[in-house]
Amino acid sequence: MTGETRKERSKWDTKGPPDIVEISEDESLPMNMDDHKKGNDDHRKGSDLLPSQDFGHGNDKQIGESLNLKSTVSMHHGSAGHEQDRADGLNKDIKERSSKASSERLPLRMGDEDHNKNDWHNRGFEKAAGNQGMSRYADDRRRGDGWGTTLSRGYSSRISSSGPDAWKRSRSPLSPRGGWNRSRRNRSRSRSRSRSIGRGRGRSRSRSRSPYFSDRGSEWRVERSRSSGGPALPCRDFVAGRCRRGSNCRFPHEDGVRRQFDEHYPVDSREKYGHQNRDFMDPREQDDYLRNRPPRGGHYDEGTWERSEPRREYRSTMPCHDFVKGRCSRGANCRYVHDDSTPHGGWRDEVRDNAIGRSGPDSSYGNRTEHRRTNKNPCKFFANGGCRRGQNCPYLHEEASQSQMGLGAPDEPGYTGGPTTRGDYLSWSEQNNSVQASSHVLSRDDRENPVPQGTGRNDSRYENKNRHSKDAGSSQYQIFPQDDFGSVGQNKPEIAASQLPQFIPSVQTGTESINIDKVSDMGGQSGPGTVGNLSMQIGMHSANLLGGHNLGQKAESQDAISQISAAPSLPGATQLQNTTSSVPLNSQVQQSDFSLHPNRQDQFAVPHATTNNSAPSMQSQPVAPYMGHSQHGYIMGAQSLPDLSVHNGQIFNVGQVPQNLPTIVHAGQNQATSDTPNLGRDSGDQGLQNTHNFQPVAPNEQTQSQTLQGLSVVASSSSVDMAGAPLSHNAVSSQEEVRRVTASLAQYFVPSLTADTSGLQSSQPDPNSSLMNNSSAAPQAVQPNHWPWLQQAGMVQPSHIVPPEQPAPQTFQAPMAAGSSNGNPLLLPHSVAPTVPAAALATNETTPAENKKEEPKDTDAEANEDGENKKSKDSKALKMFKLALADFVKDALKPTWKEGQMSREVHKTIVKKVVDKVTTTVENTPQTKEKIDIYMSYSREKLNKLVQAYVGKYAKKD
């Protein structure tokens, strides 16, 4: 029997692989059940035989089962040799198994359970004699060390699949562990032959009670895989959210959720290639969609997916781009850094900016992350007060100072109406109690469309001037460098400290407009001129600072000033006893500190400065009226100011401050004529005068008067840095030099001059101020229209006087013109007009100048030629002006003409009368079409009144 048993064993050794397949198969249960019945019948027939015979019957049953399985498999593949390869390849499918669809795993698990119930228990108890087959299967499970289970499960999954495709998928080995499993299986099979029958029976019985798909959890599989030396791979299906095995899954589930974030993101194609590809699609967008999409299996919120704290070894230092975009749903479980300060690409800034632009600064997206401003340019929307981005705006939200904004502030959009500066400044209303006056600045580009610019806005320069006027002493003449507003009283000589009469510059026109006049750019021969920002504070006690002292010269950085051709400018040559002041400016403008020294107890003499000639172009801007602390911002041309108490005898007492400041005082060889604009033509108020109205605030105190000549008052709102200039007595009164200078100036100012005017028509001076001239009994005045550049010894005419009690608007004129004396260009400053009521303006407009003196003596032939050219140009300009007036009068007469209330002759008469009246009154004819349009726009009301007056006069006669 032993020989037969060995023979039978050696006989079935060649068919060993079918034994393994027979025990592992899942879907061959009907065939196995038939074989079980047949085996049971054989077992009942041979029940009285020996145990060896029983073993033989068990082998017969095994042979039947093997033959049945072999025949079944042979129908598909044809030979048992292929079955051996297929069985070997099943061990190699451990890595393919986890990536299969979930539809293959559910039947697998159910098939395994049926296999455990039917096959294992039935065979374990019905075939007690078949211990060899059981021992072989037990040996396979024991020597698998975790991999035998894979063999059984993998084979079962292939059998559960339909057709030979499942076998074909398992043909190609993907892992080098196949040969290792095959060698271990062969050694285990050889060892199983030498084991005893009882041991095999007991082992098979014990194994049958605990099938390989027990509910012992996944820990034992992890331990077995680690003990066998294999890596503990995470469950990919659990990471993808579709693992249905739960605790029975052989792969670990802990921290598997973090595996999907281990891969580094690819380089953004937008950052790599720019925006060249229109069909750009960010691969991270697809990852975000897959990452944030809930899985179909419903395991998104199960178990370890909602872990509150991820493992620290999976933490990455890379920023979470989902959090930057504002859509990271992982919260604290995200392994990437949730930090707003981490650097990121520029396209994320675009996403953020676009989102902020759509939703506004108060949205949750805008508040979630803090935007970093890397751009140093100011935000123009913030200057207008309408930036919707708020703190997320990449541009600076700090209002730039006017020096940074440049000189063309009126032309820059958004400069007015914006928020005030953030500095700790005092408001004008608290410091000065001044009346807020709005003004219009007319530049070359927007003369027809004036930009309203409030003078009451908080400007750092003006506020600092007001604040420094209190600190620097109340009785002194000071010059504040425009770059030294932060330091008070630096390089400013204090003359005395006491209460002072406060002078108020009148700054407003009848039409609330400030005209920036023409500046001619001339080539100069000598050094740069000096322009000072004169802050006038007159006190009782003052030190006697003689002319010629350098008072706080401070050279500052020099800014180029753009030349502006704006409102028309008219020459006003006021030459007192053949003395003129040259007020030169170079492209390098400097600022100087001036101080007035007392001449005697009741008088102040303005020390003069020796200056060099240059060719500037300068822009003037409005200066707010300072009514509280008498801190006046002027730009005083660093002029050659002679002591007029000696040369001209012009003395201004305290109660009698000069109305008409002489605009020209000559020093040395430099003679010039000042270019005074015609406010009547530019703003429609012909009666506005170019005079400075000083109103003393404390007239009862013992004060001193000053001798002022050649003081040019210019608005100091431009960002011009100026340096100091020495003050010295250099007065020259030469009749010959005056004639030569006036002749040479004609060639530059022919378009803006008229040959038939030589006197000065005075405006309404302040009764509190009078000009005492030793050489002429009449006080000086400035004519609003043309005034002659040929005047050599000025006899000035008095004019209407308006009491200061009338709250009339005031004008601030900023005209400039450049002249030349022997090739030396000169900057001619302006004066400021007083407040004049509308009635006085209308009267002064229609009233011709009285007692006008002419100085026609000019021996230069060059002047005569220039006069002829001037007349020809004036005739063309006058013709254009008359045509414009005629059109205007015709439009005004249309309603009356259509109603038939006047005849054709009356219509023509009215048109002719109005045109003649205006042209004879307005001697300074506008030269260009733009200037004519400006005049017509500002003079519309007055012209209408004049037309209606003639209509009432001539229509009644008909």
From Swiss-Prot:
Residues 428-441, 686-707, 756-778, 808-824 have a biased composition (Polar residues). The keyword Zinc-finger applies. It comes from the Eukaryota. Residues 152-163, 832-843 have a biased composition (Low complexity). The keyword Repeat applies. A zinc finger (C3H1-type) spans 229-256, 314-341, 373-400. Residues 182-208 have a biased composition (Basic residues). SUPFAM superfamilies: CCCH zinc finger. Residues 1-16, 33-47, 80-126, 216-226, 273-291, 298-311, 346-355, 458-471, 850-860 have a biased composition (Basic and acidic residues). Residues 1-235, 273-311, 346-378, 403-491, 670-707, 756-781, 799-873 are annotated as: Disordered. GO terms for molecular function: DNA binding; zinc ion binding. Pfam families: zf-CCCH, zf-CCCH_2, zf-CCCH_4. InterPro entries: Zinc_finger_CCCH, Znf-CCCH_4, Znf_CCCH, Znf_CCCH_sf. Keywords: DNA-binding, Metal-binding, Repeat, Zinc, Zinc-finger. This is Zinc finger CCCH domain-containing protein 55.
